[in-house]
Amino acid sequence: MREPDLCFVGRVIKAGTAEGEALVSSEPIGFLGGVDGETGVVTERGHPLEGRCVAGKVLVFPTGKGSTVGSYVLYQLAAAGRAPAAIVNAESEPIVAVGAIIAEIPMVDRVPIEALETGDLLQLEG
């Protein structure tokens, strides 16, 4: 893959390295009821990513929302081989942070996500 065009320093939530295509949402994501835990497809009606699959992508969104069970949906995605390669948030919150930790998904926050677009090549090192 080619080298990324931009470089940001964020706060590491779950250490690790990852590389992949960005899948960017301007809206928060709620994993319980918003993402199918077996397929990785965003199912929340009206969400900007509705119908898109998070598997293998660097998932970029402002913050999480919804039930604490959302952490386990991230774990379910990992167990099914359908997890995102990494997560980038503007500001993390406990639901997504715990999910990333238990699912071993590299995660950072405090990144200016408005500078990122779906399809960008992203590399995380943390």
What are these regions (language model features)?
Residues 3-18, 23-126:
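Feature captures the catalytic cores and cofactor-binding loops of soluble hydro-lyases/lyases
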